[in-house]
Amino acid sequence: MIHPAARRVFVFVPLIAASLAAQTATYFPSRGHWAPHQSPAELGFDPAKLQEAVAFAQANGSTWDFDRDQVRTFGAVLGPLPKQRAVTNGIILRHGYIAAQFGDTKAADPVYSVAKSFISTVCSLAVERGLIKDVNDPVARYIQDGGYDSPHNAKITWKDHLQQESEWEGTLWGKNADFVGAEQFGRGERKAREIHDPGTFYEYNDVRINRFSLSLARLFGKGLPEVLKTDIMDPIGASPTWHWYGYFNSTVEINGKPVESVSGGTRWGGGLWIDSEDLARFGLLILNHGRWEGQQIISAQWLRDATSPSAHGPDYGYLWWLNTQQKQWPHAPKSSFAALGNGSNCIWIDPDHDIVFVWHWYRNAALDGMIERILAAVQQ
């Protein structure tokens, strides 16, 4: 549905233009409260066309079923899964205001690999604090838990992990990084192949991302959910309903205390469970170069680096999906980028039009069509 504010009577075009000119400053919602709301017309949208986009989204909800699809697609489950999920839901922001929303946007569900972009953002804090001197440094220089002892793994840098080019070898939480074996990996199993040097080959690989997550937890000396909550989610006014889970067997000892190492997705259960409204806040933070009102929470330089394509990935940055070649989403600007997860789930960010679009539980092939319709609704 179009946001209730859209039901106001139409105003003359000069008044709309004046409204747009007056709202050059981005609106940042306070904790638990997203107001004042603006109508689509006041935000530069054609209300009828925006309603068409919402109708398209509602017609393209996911058919994903945890009981039917999870194990056969991904293999043996290691962590929690919800008993049921919400239906498709989402939010369209412009200039920080809600232009449209649909479905239950307060349903905190797993977002699968959207969590990877959160790991990237948490890593930025380690760099800013000097815990990581340079992303080109070998991880082994910082982490001595046996995971980087081999001559091959000793070459892996933080940047290799960030770009999914680590080629880390080993087993973590009962899953081998080679993804060989249907029991453990379901339809996602892969054939054995030659391992390449770190930094020379891209492979989307959750075992290696989970290794990266564990390394960051050891570096911070605490669980990543604690870091995320204290340094990112609380400052942007996120709700208390989100949770970031690991696996039933992923608890380690750090500084003499048990810490659950969290996963970079929900492929084997666990992962980040979060609602569309909190995802929209996070997306708004990223859209505004890491700044929330007067506070610089994430380094703007980090975000520039994170949204620059790697040498070997499929238009991929630091665990963010890019569109520099306009292959991901042909109807989207080259500057747009996204956090993507199975299900499907996304945070799509469009700096050219100052838009954040969050979509929970949609058919993967529908995203470009949805983007096309959102942008067709933009008038100015």
Predicted regions and their residues:
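N-terminal leader/targeting segments and the immediately adjacent pre-domain N-terminus
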Residues: L15-D104, R129-I132, R218, K222, ...
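Active-site-proximal loop and beta-strand segments within enzyme catalytic domains
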Residues: G32, P36-Q38, Q58, T63-P82, ...
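Active-site SXXK
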Residues: D46, G96, P110-V135, H161, ...
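Catalytic-site signature segments of enzymes, centered on catalytic residues
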Residues: I98-K106, W168-F248, G270
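Active-site-proximal alpha-helical segments within enzyme catalytic domains
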Residues: S117, R208-S215, G270-R291, N345-W361
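Active-site helix/loop module of the DD-peptidase/beta-lactamase fold
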Residues: R129-W168, F220-G269
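Active-site Gly/Thr loop motif
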Residues: P240, Y245, S250-T266, S308-V356
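Structured C-terminal helix/loop/strand segments within mature extracytoplasmic catalytic/sensor domains
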Residues: A338-Q380
